[in-house]
């Protein structure tokens, strides 16, 4: 079975969904921009040699509908002979795109895959047009479709206090801001056209969503967002709403060698699991455990972790379940996470994987694990090994 290696990994800046930098930029354009950029950065690869494009996107309607992967590839002027498919595993969509592209290479159905994902939550809100089947109420609690209430459930089950959630949110913003100031995101962010507050076209090369002024006093003043009577989860301890795209170029190790391209890492293992929809945020725990088992590794072998911060309560419950609370400041989300950067649903899986790869290189770490919770009760994880 072929080893699958990561050649390149990039993303757009994260734009604020409400009146932000990408308010006049379409999701297809964000995607096409990254596709073109990946190809221009790797001229050794002829675009016609891409076997397939896998692109994550959750709300596949309006500008994100009718197979946005293909629409974006056509906008990027990738040869018509290269196919493209849109992948939807909700929050884990672009990580699933990575898994699908990698698996095709592993079994010999492909040599090169371009993968990524996008979500423009300013143009297509998360709940746009959603109509749950009423019969689901027989087996699944209605609140399981309300992500904030699933976070409240985890907070209660795992005794996650309001104070610890607020502290985690402050940490996310502080770390993301520090990473920005130190240019630690520079290697992964591709400057992207947007509009400033006055509507003037400009190129953005920084994440617009980070709030460096976030502090415990300000967060403590916020009301619970989902359970107004007994809740502890607030807007400040939930992932920000943002717009963005991410992309990765992956190929077989043998193809990379023949093209003279230097791999950054290889995929050591992949895993997807299901869990109770009412505690969907706990999915990263069994997903990570399965990925470790498939990789033949132990938790202590992993030098760095990227956990998508859907909610502080959800993140802390997972870290507690994995036994990572004590090592969090040394190993987990060292550049902040979705509470500060936002969680453009279809983009996030490849985004956290890209951030993880850069951290692994900067800190000379051999193994890294990226994992995410998924709405309606799933978890997904990928273990990367530097080569």
From Swiss-Prot:
Alphabetical GO biological process terms: fatty acid beta-oxidation; phenylacetate catabolic process
One Pfam entry name: Thiolase_C
PROSITE patterns, alphabetized: THIOLASE_1 (PS00098), THIOLASE_2 (PS00737), THIOLASE_3 (PS00099)
GO molecular function: acetyl-CoA C-acyltransferase activity
Catalysed reactions listed for this entry: an acyl-CoA + acetyl-CoA = a 3-oxoacyl-CoA + CoA
Active-site residues, Swiss-Prot/TrEMBL: 91 (acyl-thioester intermediate), 343 (proton acceptor), 373 (proton acceptor)
Predominant place of localization: cytoplasm
Broad class of enzyme this protein falls into: transferase
Keywords: Acyltransferase, Cytoplasm, Fatty acid metabolism, Lipid degradation, Lipid metabolism, Transferase
UniProt subcellular location: Cytoplasm
Subunit structure: Heterotetramer of two alpha chains (FadB) and two beta chains (FadA).
Function, in words: Catalyzes the final step of fatty acid oxidation in which acetyl-CoA is released and the CoA ester of a fatty acid two carbons shorter is formed.
Protein name (record): 3-ketoacyl-CoA thiolase
Lineage, highest ranks first: Bacteria, Pseudomonadati, Pseudomonadota, Gammaproteobacteria, Enterobacterales
Encoding gene (name): fadA
């Amino acid at each position: 079975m072929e080893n699958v290696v990561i050649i390149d990994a990039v993303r757009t800046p994260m734009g604020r969904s409400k009146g932000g930098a990408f308010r006049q930029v379409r999701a297809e354009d964000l995607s096409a921009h990254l596709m073109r950029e990946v190809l221009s950065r790797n001229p050794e690869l002829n675009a016609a040699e891409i076997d397939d494009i896998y692109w994550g996107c959750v709300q596949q309607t309006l500008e994100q509908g009718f197979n946005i992967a293909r629409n974006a590839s056509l906008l990027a002027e990738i040869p018509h002979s290269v196919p493209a498919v849109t992948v939807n595993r909700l929050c884990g969509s672009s990580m699933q795109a990575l898994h699908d592209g990698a698996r095709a290479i592993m079994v010999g159905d492909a040599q090169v895959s371009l993968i990524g994902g996008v979500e423009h939550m300013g143009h297509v809100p998360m709940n746009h047009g959603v109509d749950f089947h009423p019969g689901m109420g027989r087996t699944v609690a209605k609140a399981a479709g309300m992500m904030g209430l699933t976070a409240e459930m985890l907070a209660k089950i795992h005794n996650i206090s309001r104070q610890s959630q607020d502290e985690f949110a402050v940490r996310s913003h502080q770390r993301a801001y520090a990473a920005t100031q130190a240019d630690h995101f520079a290697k992964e962010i591709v400057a992207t056209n947007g509009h400033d507050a006055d509507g003037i076209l400009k190129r953005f090369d920084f994440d617009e969503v980070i709030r460096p002024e976030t502090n415990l006093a300000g967060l403590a003043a916020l009301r619970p967002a989902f359970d107004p009577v007994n809740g502890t989860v607030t807007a400040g301890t939930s992932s920000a709403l943002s717009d963005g795209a991410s992309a990765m170029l992956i190929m077989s190790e043998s193809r990379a060698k023949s093209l003279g391209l230097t791999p950054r890492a290889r995929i050591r293992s992949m895993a997807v699991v299901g869990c109770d929809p009412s505690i969907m945020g706990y999915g990263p725990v069994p997903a990570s455990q399965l990925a470790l088992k498939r990789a033949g590794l132990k938790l202590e072998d992993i030098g760095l972790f990227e956990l998508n911060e859907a909610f502080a309560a959800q993140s802390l419950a997972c870290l507690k379940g994995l036994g990572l609370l004590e090592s969090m400041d040394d190993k987990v989300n060292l550049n902040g996470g979705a509470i500060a950067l936002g969680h453009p649903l279809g983009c996030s899986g490849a985004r956290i994987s890209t951030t993880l790869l850069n951290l692994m290189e900067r800190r000379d770490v051999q193994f890294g694990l990226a994992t995410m919770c998924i709405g309606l009760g799933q978890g997904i994880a990928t273990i990367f090994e530097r080569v």
